Amino acid sequence: MMEKHFVGSEIGQLRSVMLHRPNLSLKRLTPSNCQELLFDDVLSVERAGEEHDIFANTLRQQGIEVLLLTDLLTQTLDVADAKAWLLDTQISDYRLGPTFAADIRAWLADMPHRELARHLSGGLTYGEIPASIKNMVVDTHDINDFIMKPLPNHLFTRDTSCWIYNGVSINPMAKPARQRETNNLRAIYRWHPQFAGGDFIKYFGDEDINYDHATLEGGDVLVIGRGAVLIGMSERTTPQGVEFLAQALFKHRQAERVIAVELPKHRSCMHLDTVMTHIDIDTFSVYPEVVRPDVQCWTLTPDGRGGLKRTQESTLVHALEKALGIDQVRLITTGGDAFEAEREQWNDANNVLTLRPGVVVGYERNIWTNEKYDKAGITVLPIPGDELGRGRGGARCMSCPLERDGI
């Protein structure tokens, strides 16, 4: 049955969330391919799965519904149109050649849906297909070459789609290693019974077009509430993507302002939520680099003619105070000395998931920052992340809220 989905803030009571448990895609990571697949290291997949189970159970113990991406994708494949569309989009004639692609699609179409879902996220090698499928393409590849590359970054469900007030952006991803993720989410939101026919807006990203430089990823999008959205312009989210999303939000009267902040273009700051998260009404966790006075920041508002009015702000902090209607934003910076703070930011100390005002989930290893949270009255529900953290994503990165109260 279709349900109502609404995300009204970053800090209101979290009610439903989508996660992705580590699976086949991470088992495909090797030292020789991990950089191409946007990982810095290979993980112990079994241990990462155990850590992820603790994360999911921590949320369930707080009364939060946890939906798993593989389950949603499997159930979506039960819809014939969804399966046909996914096979057409994920197995391209132009990538494999028309005859080989047709043979692979036919073989995959007969596969049990859970196994097919496993390959749609985990990839498929030439060595896994039946010997009866013969083609020049097969003859010219090694058995360990990929027909479909794995999608290990599905672990970070925050990025591929993000719910903003009464709608969702299904994001055109910046890197080729992640672009096929979007098709899996497009299918889920179009055909899965929980979403099909739903009364929600699709702001951006659900068209069969080349979005070129207009890329957007959910780790850069913070729904700070009270009609405002904060978006980081990072190495993954561009000003072009921000403008398209802002125009859609204003067109559908879902936001009154979008704050756009320019982020340093380096790996440790790949998304806004790796350096900044909203954890209480007036409180943000930040790595100090993002709130320097020289960081450029703009507020976008409707111009009354379908376009955008742009106002440059003196500082990000000032823009946040105006948007939230508060006198002073409280900033909790990454803990420890300069060396410890850099290490903990790298290990996602600022990338916490707020469950309700003043209560967050974060990695237990970030002892200095967690101590600062505690002293500031923020409750941290700790989870292990020795393996999960190797992917450079914390609790916020690994979660896509589907329902959350406003403020």
UniProtKB/Swiss-Prot annotation:
SUPFAM superfamilies documented for this protein: Pentein
Localization of this protein: Cytoplasm
InterPro entries: Arg_deiminase
Domain of life (superkingdom): Bacteria
Chief place where the protein resides: cytoplasm
Active site positions, chain numbering: C397
Pfam families: ADI (PF02274)
BP terms from Gene Ontology: arginine catabolic process to ornithine; arginine deiminase pathway
GO cellular component, one term: cytoplasm
Family designation: Belongs to the arginine deiminase family.
Protein name: Arginine deiminase
Organism from which the protein derives: Salmonella paratyphi C (strain RKS4594)
